[in-house]
Amino acid sequence: LKTFRWTIFFLVLVSASLQAQDRPLLDISIKAFDANLPESSLDQQQSGIYPAVRQAEVRYLPSFLKLMLEESGQWGAVRLLPDLDTGAELQLSATIVSSDGSTLELAIRAIDASGRIWTDKIYTGTAVESVSLNEPVLGTDPFLYLYTAITGDLLMVYQSLTSQDLQGIKDIATLRYGAALAPDVFSPYLNQDESGLYQLTRFPADNDPFLMRIREIREHEYVFIDVVDEQYEDFFVSIKPVYDVWRRYRREMLASEADKVRLEQEQGSDFRRGSYMSLRESYNNYRWSRLQDQYLDEINAGFINEVLPTDITLEDSLFHLSGTLDEQYKEWRGILKELYMLDNPQTP
């Protein structure tokens, strides 16, 4: 806890230092986390993984990280997406290594548009019940220290870059987005070396018609991203109360199991069927089973918005998107690419 307080103090100092500087702010694109879910139900059971909870964490955990980054005030727009963002200035992705309510392990990778890796490691946190910071949402998460470590690492890299570096990242992101739609037009502006890093060969003029159209198409994509973001936010708000309780009871269950093992070792044959401790253990298991069924039902109910269709108006046309958010996002990007090609039939 002492280390946690010093980390918070350090971030406050870094934040104050950065606010005093006139530097370009990078937008962050966060991909919904990889569930890392074993294929067989037996493997899931042996690993103590509940599929409904893990699928909820795929959305919940990045939503909390997004909130942390936004609250720091040191970034541009922070967006949570169902897939990787081809035009991301700073792309963040993660795999849930383990999550049992008591400990949380996330394999985090952050890479900017130039190919520079900001962080690529596993962050591990142990639940801290007493975390508060007088924050109604941020301060109630038992793994706040883990998220603070992630945001702190990102801020350290950001602070190490010059304004020219940051603007270069933003320009490369724009051109990489353009190259995904019209490679023949925008790829010549970029050079990728053997290590995978991108450099600008030159940047098109601001009044370049292709660049202007790409920027317009990008804004159209943000329209759908705003819809996705709203759905993720609704999911986060609706699932947080039951997820918090579920994690707390998971910690209690794990502690109870540890106590049982300890008592069995201490008491040996005295810990027998029909004894008070054995009966209490049976009751706790029954109680946990009933509570778990209730919580899993509520968590499953939180996915209702995941498959709701989306209607979006674009340039006097109405588009109806259906399927999961991931499927809708891919469909929308396909529509935007077709729109670009229709507007630029002579694209080389």
Regions found by a protein language model. Give the residues of each.
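An acidic helix/loop motif centered on a single conserved Asp/Glu
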Residues: 30-70
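C-terminal/domain-edge helix-coil "capping" segments
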Residues: 21-23, 127-348
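A short, hydrophobic beta-strand-centered structural micro-motif
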Residues: 28, 77-108
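Amphipathic beta-strand/beta-sheet edge segments enriched in Tyr/Trp
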Residues: 93-133
